[in-house]
């Protein structure tokens, strides 16, 4: 069982670290409306999202943060009952993504704890702007 959870921990750590590094980079390089075009419709553009998926529910950050914590607890508890390595890795991805965005909500703010905005930066121009954490949750 412990060996299986090592995979979860690796997935979780990779998501949180990559997510926070890319968000730090975006805040440093994409301020003032700067857009970096990469390929075809892919570009990097800084967006601050105080809502949840697709910017819905803006302004309800503290409520969403509490709900996210409850979902994390549920996913971890559910994942603890699974024996499949792929399911345990998926739990690591989902929890890592949730924690990555929760870090933003908690600490990327000037208005108070849990009132921050999630930093999004990956813009395909035909889909809402996302970040590594959200991509990990969806995968």
Indicate residue ranges for each PLM-predicted region:
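Alpha-helical transmembrane bundles and membrane-interface segments of multipass inner-membrane proteins
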Residues: 1-139
């Amino acid at each position: 069982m412990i060996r299986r959870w090592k995979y979860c921990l690796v997935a979780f750590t990779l998501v949180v670290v990559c997510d926070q590094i890319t968000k730090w980079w975006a805040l440093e390089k994409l301020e003032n409306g700067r857009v970096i075009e990469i390929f075809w419709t892919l570009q990097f553009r800084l967006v601050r999202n105080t809502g949840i998926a697709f910017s819905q529910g803006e302004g309800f950050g503290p409520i969403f943060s509490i709900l996210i914590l409850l979902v994390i607890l549920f996913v971890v508890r559910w994942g603890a009952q699974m024996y499949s390595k792929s399911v345990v890795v998926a739990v690591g991805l989902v929890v890592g993504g949730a924690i990555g965005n929760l870090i933003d909500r908690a600490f990327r703010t000037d208005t108070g704890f849990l009132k921050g905005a999630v930093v999004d930066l990956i813009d395909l121009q035909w889909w809402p702007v996302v970040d590594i954490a959200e991509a990990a949750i969806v995968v």
